[in-house]
Structure formats: structure tokens, C-alpha cells
């Protein structure tokens, strides 16, 4: 992986990790240790056939009861659940609970209203695969 791609991957993951940490703490300020999510970067890769776009792949782990605040990615985001149970919802759609092997999609205009571990006792882990504009943040708060 070249230095530019590595820097982009680390920057995207750092922004997402900071956002997950602060958003999760806000969900239950009395128990910040209970709600933290962590993001682990796996890959950032330019898409030469789609100028100006890149793929970002990472894993997100929620501790039991963990959640994030409403947000958007301005990207096509595909989620694949590895373990545990995850509650997902975008505006205009009913919430869904996903288990291992199940998938979820967020479109570029979607506000991701709910992203949470559906269990109060077990962690949840999922892979995030996003196609996004280069040099733009991976995640931002919902308007």
C-alpha cells in the first residue's frame, strides 16, 4: 500500500473512531465505557475506473449496548455483520435487526438514524465497505 493510500485509510478510520467514541458516549454519559465503538481500518483503495472515488473497508465493533448518533456518509455503504446482532435504520425505512451473514445498504443521501448493538450482553462486529469521494470525510453528523 502506498503512503498516500495508507494516510487516507488512517485518516478515515481516525475520523470514524473519534465520531464513534464521542457519539457512543453521548448515548449514555453515565456509562461511557459501556457504549464505545471501535473502528479498525482494513483498506483504502483508489478506483482508477471511477475517477475521484475510493473504496474504504473497515470493521466496527460495538460493545454490549453500544450505539452511535445519527449520521451520514455521503457514500454508498455496505455492511456485513460478522458477529452479534446489530440494529440499523435509515430515514424513511423501518428498523432492521441483522445477525451474522446479513447485509445492509446506506445510499449517499441517507441519514443513518440508528446504528446500535441490539444486545446488552454480547458485542457486535461488522465490516463496512464504502465507495466514497476521495479527500472527503468518511462520516459526518446528520444535519
What is each stretch, according to the model?
Residues 95, 109-136:
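Ligand-binding loop in jelly-roll beta-barrel domains
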Residues 52, 62-63, 92-109:
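Short acidic-glycine-tyrosine-enriched beta hairpin
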Residues 2-10, 16-56, 89, 105, ...:
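A short, N-terminal "cap"/entry segment at the start of jelly-roll beta-barrel domains
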Residues 50-52, 72, 97, 118-123:
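Extracellular/periplasmic catalytic domains that process cell-envelope and extracellular macromolecules
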Residues 53, 65-78:
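A short beta-loop-beta micro-motif enriched in histidine and acidic residues
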Residues 67-69, 87, 104, 108-117:
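Histidine-centered metal-chelating micro-motifs
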Residues 73-92, 100-102:
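Glycine- and acidic-residue-biased ligand/ion/polar-headgroup-sensing regions
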Amino acid at each position: 500500500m502506498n503512503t498516500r493510500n495508507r494516510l487516507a485509510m488512517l485518516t478515515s478510520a481516525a475520523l470514524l473512531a473519534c465520531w464513534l467514541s464521542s457519539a457512543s458516549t453521548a448515548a449514555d454519559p453515565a456509562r461511557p465505557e459501556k457504549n464505545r465503538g471501535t473502528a479498525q481500518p482494513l483498506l483504502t483503495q483508489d478506483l482508477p475506473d471511477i475517477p475521484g472515488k475510493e473504496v474504504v473497508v473497515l470493521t466496527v465493533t460495538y460493545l454490549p449496548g453500544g450505539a452511535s448518533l445519527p449520521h451520514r456518509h455521503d457514500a454508498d455503504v455496505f455492511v456485513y455483520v460478522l458477529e452479534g446482532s446489530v440494529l440499523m435504520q435509515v430515514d424513511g425505512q423501518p428498523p432492521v435487526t441483522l445477525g451474522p451473514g446479513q447485509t445492509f445498504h446506506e445510499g449517499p443521501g441517507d441519514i443513518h438514524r440508528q446504528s446500535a448493538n441490539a444486545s446488552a450482553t454480547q458485542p457486535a462486529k461488522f465490516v463496512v465497505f464504502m465507495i466514497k469521494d476521495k479527500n472527503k470525510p468518511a462520516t459526518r453528523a446528520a444535519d
